[in-house]
């Protein structure tokens, strides 16, 4: 009797009357046109190992001949075993693929009442603020602007140019928690969580498996090798790889393509991860304030005391997911786009400008049940138009994002610098040394030196004189530069908005 032990996918074990055959490393499930395996064949304590494609007749013949000589077993017996093994592995592969497909969330059929409730939500006046309130009631604590920004970016997965977002902060600050809780408001069939990501793993997805999906990467720090194909997928909306297929009588080059577009969300503690991906993604900094700590701890106490209505939370999550399900893939046209300017100081202005425009479109897209449906008379394509209110909402939500993209300092250094300014002003100190600040701010000397070097090189600090203890005494060149940059960005956005309003008034 032939049996295939499927307990360990990485070490399948086949047994029949004569042979025990281990399939080391398992088999690939993504291809049906080949069956490449590494076999460990055993008969009466004699062992033979061989790697081959079981669909390649030449390789199978060579295996049978060599195994017969090594194991001292008839070629007919080994032939029967290999044929039986091949059939067992084919059935195993089909079963596994069917199981994988069965595990994929299937589109949900909404009832008439559910559709009615979802439409009612999407037609609500002041939709963004109402949505943000619901997000908070669903269990997302604090992070008022970040959570709404993230939700709109996740919504953009349904558009032709999805946006991407990176959550940044130190370990234990709640990056993954924010991403996970907001993602729970997106339908299961439209999102996928990825924990173990390598460069080659992207090519195992089916051609359209990622198309218009939300991809959640919990730890970008551990996925550095996969960032190149990820960037290609974000920018070009597809990735392609060629390999040589040797399963037939003649090797041939085969191309494997995975298509987007895809909305990518990830978390990181490393600034370099952001620097390399900043021109493709929005960056949010997690709220690490004492007030946020207090909010979270109070919520935890309320949960423990049984005072949180978990049923209400689940109903809100379902409502928000259903509202996402009924959003249609409509085109958005922004009639004011040519009037919209960004501060010249922003990092990578061309990309940032595109992100700014796409974010405005995403807000319009989310308001589609409150917009007039227009039809292009030439192409017959349906579309909706951006309103001035959409631009106002985008400016409000993106102000901090644009500020970070305009800042020449790294995010961590900026955070340190603002803390340093507050301390020096409070203590009425004008000059300082590395050792002095390390002691006063309770930061490691190496970190302080690194920050001061960056601040000096970028002309935020100047050397006042040499210190008696060695090193230098520093002085801050301007205490108002960050505030001035904020005011400049606000002023430019306001001026642009006024131009749009004036254009509308003159119509």
Report residues per predicted region:
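Short, hydrophobic-biased segments on the C-terminal half of alpha helices
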Residues: 183, 357, 452-453
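AAA+ P-loop NTPase catalytic core
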Residues: 90-147, 160-165, 377-435, 440
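Conserved ASCE/P-loop NTPase catalytic core
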Residues: 139, 148, 153-312, 321-326
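Phosphate-sensing "switch" segment of ASCE/P-loop ATPases
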Residues: 255-262, 270-418, 422
């Amino acid at each position: 009797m032939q049996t295939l032990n499927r307990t360990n996918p990485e070490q399948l074990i086949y047994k029949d009357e004569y042979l025990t055959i281990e399939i080391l490393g398992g088999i690939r499930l993504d291809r049906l046109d080949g069956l490449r395996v590494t076999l460990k064949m055993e008969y009466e304590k004699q062992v033979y190992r061989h790697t081959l494609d079981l669909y390649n007749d030449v390789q199978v013949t060579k295996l049978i001949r060599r195994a017969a000589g090594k194991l001292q077993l008839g070629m007919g017996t080994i032939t029967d075993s290999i044929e039986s093994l091949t059939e067992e592995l084919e059935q195993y592969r089909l079963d596994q693929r069917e199981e994988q497909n069965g595990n994929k969330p299937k589109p949900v059929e909404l009832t008439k009442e559910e559709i009615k409730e979802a439409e009612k939500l999407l037609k609500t006046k002041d939709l963004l603020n109402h949505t943000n309130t619901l997000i908070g009631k669903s269990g997302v604590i604090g992070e008022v602007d970040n959570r709404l920004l993230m939700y709109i970016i996740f919504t953009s997965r349904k558009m032709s140019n999805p946006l991407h977002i990176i959550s940044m902060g130190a370990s234990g600050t709640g990056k993954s928690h924010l991403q996970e809780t907001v993602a729970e408001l997106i339908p299961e069939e439209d999102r996928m969580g990825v924990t173990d990501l390598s460069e080659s793993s992207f090519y195992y997805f089916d051609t359209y498996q990622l198309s218009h999906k939300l991809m959640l990467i919990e730890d970008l720090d551990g996925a550095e090798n996969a960032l190149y194909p990820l960037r290609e997928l974000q920018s070009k909306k597809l990735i392609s790889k060629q390999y040589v297929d040797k399963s037939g009588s003649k090797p041939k080059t085969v191309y494997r393509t995975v298509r987007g577009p895809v909305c990518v969300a990830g978390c990181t503690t490393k600034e370099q991860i952001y620097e390399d991906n900043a021109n493709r993604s929005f960056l949010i900094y997690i709220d690490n304030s004492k007030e946020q700590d207090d909010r979270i701890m109070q919520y935890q106490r309320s949960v423990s005391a049984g005072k949180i209505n978990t049923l209400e939370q689940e109903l809100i999550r379902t409502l928000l997911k259903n509202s996402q399900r009924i959003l249609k893939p409509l085109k958005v046209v922004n009639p004011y786009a040519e009037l919209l300017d960004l501060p010249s100081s922003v990092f990578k202005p061309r990309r940032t400008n595109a992100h700014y425009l796409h974010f405005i479109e995403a807000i319009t897209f989310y308001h589609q049940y409150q917009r007039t449906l227009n039809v292009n008379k030439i192409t017959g394509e349906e579309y909706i138009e951006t309103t001035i209110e959409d631009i106002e909402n985008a400016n409000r939500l993106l102000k901090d994002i644009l500020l970070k993209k305009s800042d020449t300092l790294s995010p961590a250094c900026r955070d340190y610098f603002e803390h340093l300014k507050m301390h020096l002003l409070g203590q009425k100190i004008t000059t300082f040394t590395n050792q002095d600040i390390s002691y006063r701010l309770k930061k490691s000397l190496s970190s302080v030196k690194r920050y001061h070097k960056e601040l000096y090189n970028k002309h935020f600090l100047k050397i006042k004189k040499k210190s008696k203890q060695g090193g230098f005494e520093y002085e801050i060149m301007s205490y108002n530069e960050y505030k001035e940059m904020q005011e400049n960005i606000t002023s430019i956005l306001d001026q642009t908005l006024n131009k749009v309003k004036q254009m509308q008034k003159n119509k």
